[in-house]
């Protein structure tokens, strides 16, 4: 299960994620949180409390990077846990 909190500071949005980004429900929840931040210039995904990420989550990160680029928004990943960092590096 994934829980998401959003904090807006000026034109910066911090999306704090906690739990697991596993399965389509979690991936869609992440998509909704990020794509709702259309007024932000930068969106930071705080992954410090994410315990696991699987293929659907990785695919959603790719989608969100493209979405952000298309909307002139910078998407930044912040402080991923070791297991998430390993998955990101392995995925390339």
Task: List each language-model region with its residue ranges.
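Amphipathic alpha-helical interaction surfaces in cytosolic regulatory modules
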Residues: 21-92
């Amino acid at each position: 299960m994934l829980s998401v909190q959003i904090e807006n500071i000026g034109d910066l949005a911090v999306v704090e994620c906690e739990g697991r980004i596993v399965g389509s429900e979690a991936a869609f929840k992440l998509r909704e949180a990020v794509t709702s931040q259309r007024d932000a210039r930068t969106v930071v995904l705080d992954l410090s409390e994410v315990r696991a990420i699987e293929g659907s989550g990785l695919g959603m990160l790719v989608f969100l990077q493209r979405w952000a680029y298309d909307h002139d928004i910078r998407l930044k990943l912040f402080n991923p846990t070791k297991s998430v960092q390993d998955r990101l590096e392995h995925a390339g």
